Amino acid sequence: MRIHPASLVAVLTLTLASGLVAQRVKTTDPLTAYLGHGVSHPLAIWRANTISDVRYDLSLDVTAPDSAVGHVSVRFKHSGNSDAILDWRGRRLTQIMSNGRSLPLSAANGAHIRFPVKLLEAGENSVELWFVSDIAPSGASIIRSHDQTDGSDYLYTLLVPADADQLFPCFDQPDLKARVTFTLTTPPAWTALANGSIVRADSSAGRITRHFTETRPLSTYLIAFAAGPWQRTTSVVKGRSISLFVRKSRAKETDADTLLALTHRAIGWMEQYFGRPYPFEKFDLMLAPAFPFGGMEHPGVVMFNEDRFIFRERPTLPRRLGRFSTILHEVAHQWFGDLVTMRWFDDLWLKEGFATYMAAKALAELEPSSDAWKTFYQSNKPAAYGVDQTTGTTPLWQELANLDQAKSAYGAIVYNKAPSVLKQLNYLVGEKAFQAGVHQFLSDHAYANATWQDLLGEIGKAGGRSLDAFGKNFMQRPGMPEVQQRLTVRDGKIAKLELVQKPAQALSGPAAWPMRTEVWIEYPVAGGNDASGPYEPYVTRKTGEANHFPVELSAVATEVVAARGKLAPIFVFANYQDYGYFLTLLDSTSVSSLSSGALGRVGDGFLRAMLWGALWDQVRDAQLAPDRFAELTLSMLPYEMDEQVVPLLLGRLERSIRAYLAPAKVVTVTANAEHTLWDGARDSRKPYGIRKAFLDAFIGLASSVDGVAKLESLLAVDSAAGEPVRDPTRWSVVNRLLVLGAASAERAFAAQMSRDTTPDGRRRAFVAGAARKTAAVKADYFARYFADKGLNEDWASGSLGEFNALEQQDLTLPYLRPALDSLPFIQANRRIFFLGSWLGAFINGHTSDAALQTVKKFLADHPKLPKDLREKVLQNSDEIERTVRIRKRWQ
């Protein structure tokens, strides 16, 4: 099946334009403005003022393969002398009743259902609707995953941020919370789970109907159920029962006992920290096949990505910590997001930032040896800074006119900047005030909604200080500061150390951000242990001087008075322990020392990771040559023994070689990298996690004749360096051979498909197929991204990187403009993270000025592109702009 990209985009553009014309029709009916696409903010405000005490009694029959037959009774209190409007975008309605009286189906317009005031009562109302909703692998509110291993089907819902109205008619906005009662009819061999607990089950005529308890108040995006022949494992600890559901074919691979134990620990810690018990009736979790993101916090039925939670090969420390962090994140949501929910999706950061930050706090206490704050830095700061220093950045609080734009709010600002800012807030006010404010916030708004002002108000009150300036600068102000270190040394002493703020982008305005940070000063040690001395890998150095000082940043320029008169340093770092939210611009002395070997003597792994990050920022700003960074990295990697730092270094090494290096230098640097990585992967003296990271990096970089031969050798053996070569690693090798167009690639691909017939193997085969180096394959995949209704989003998003491999830019450049032209379709028809993945892959699969000009021309050709989409394009095009600049600077 093939569709020409230009034809497809023309249809999408015409459809979008027709919709916009239709919306311009004027009318004197004041409610008509509310009946357009999505849920507008004015509609949401109006309904929140006229509708209350909502209850949904929802019945669904999911015995058919592609549709669910449903009935919902909506009870609510209505005030005011006006109509009521429900939201509905499902397949079709079959009947509408309002307080026992019929409404014509024409009351629905494809987006909403209007109930005239004459059919409503002042006070209690009951409306009933009969409907049919879609079931499909993608693009539907009920996702169907077919397991080819045993022929089973599994269903689950995913309604975030505003797709509940595809499942059933409802008031689909977060501040109209409702109590929900499910009734689910399924095939008799299936299990069903939902937000509530099962109270009874009735069997008849080859089906089973389960009735569930009424929930506590929930926002519509949190309503959820799942159905299928799940295998269930239950654990009871201190009277709390938690069940894990996983599909039958993967049950033996699942470490159910570990996952349940981690969940019990997570809930216990959160209950203690928040000072209130788990706020919902039950807690079950399920591993969802083809789940399009990491997890979703539905109360009572928390869903996780199956592939991220089932380890098909021995997991490294980062993978184990990542899985536990995801559990902690979703458990934290039960209080922050579920118990107390943002009033509108402009405050999305409130729940996501808090969940990530609380997960880090919990991990630090529950796993003291995990270096949780180093993990937090590596997981959040590079991603946050990478977006927040672009011209497409947004404030944490993102103005949102309509919920159909809410998907655009998801990204690094919400998930990575927000928790980083909360860490600064916690440090600023102190732990006692922070926790007391959180307690009061949860108490005041339990089972209701709140705003960021409510949160800062309580924390500020607990700390006895106003946080108005903090809110203005970190919640409402776009962008971020850069902090330049200015070091003056005289007679072997520090004469002055000054920290100077400036905005990373002019859109932030010139004012300083109020912050507190800690400054680290690395002094020379007697015996010549300085940047020019003999190399001493990763030792902890001691000095009689105080090494770090707290500093309040309240002005554009701030002197570190405590540093005055101290020994002239080897280097300085302005954000020790990562409390500040700013990009550190190192002084020339520090850059010279760190890039000449001093970095190798820093014994603190957390500090070392941040210093590597500061040097990488020098590379991205075209101030440090990428080949110099690669050489430094390769010289230090053999000595680095931190399992969390090594993967970060290897990722940057790969980017510097594959994207930033001038073509004339690629062959030499790649050969050095292949040698270092191959030796490291086979060095049995290294911890497993480091050897695995070296092997993964080798697979991602190998391109020489010798490198390809080594890749092929991995497929010919059962083990390497004492470790089994499992299928996930074999697939990575196959992917690389396909990207390179190696002579053995197709044979290896066919052999691996025959070898690995598991559900995960079939997914990986689809992903690998996108890497095949032919124009016909690219055309076929691009068409399937739009036209294949059986293609689920997890598979599609997973293949985007292979489709856009840097080594195949000549094949993929023709698809860059069609990919950009399709953005309205992607936003309307794909889930929350797909848009960012799409843009990141298609734009940053390129390093050429021609690709950059394609992006710029797209923006110039669409001056009326919706603001949120323009921002997403600008966020993602920043990297290719840097790439082109770096390659020109260091060619």
Regions found by a protein language model. Give the residues of each.
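Non-catalytic accessory/interaction domains
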Residues: 2, 183-186, 201, 246-248, ...
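Bacterial N-terminal signal peptides
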Residues: 7-19
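Hydrophobic alpha-helical and helix-loop surface patches within well-folded domains
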Residues: 21-22, 33, 212, 243-506, ...
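N-terminal, polar/Ser/Thr-rich
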Residues: 22-69, 149-154, 172-174, 467-469
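A surface-exposed beta-strand-loop module
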Residues: 25, 84, 88-148, 169, ...
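Ligand-binding face of N-terminal immunoglobulin V-set domains in extracellular IgSF glycoproteins
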Residues: 69-88
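Hydrophobic helix-coil surface modules that form long, contiguous segments used
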Residues: 70, 159-162, 169-328, 357-360, ...
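Surface-exposed, acidic/Ser/Thr-rich flexible loop segments
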Residues: 118-191, 505-517, 521-523
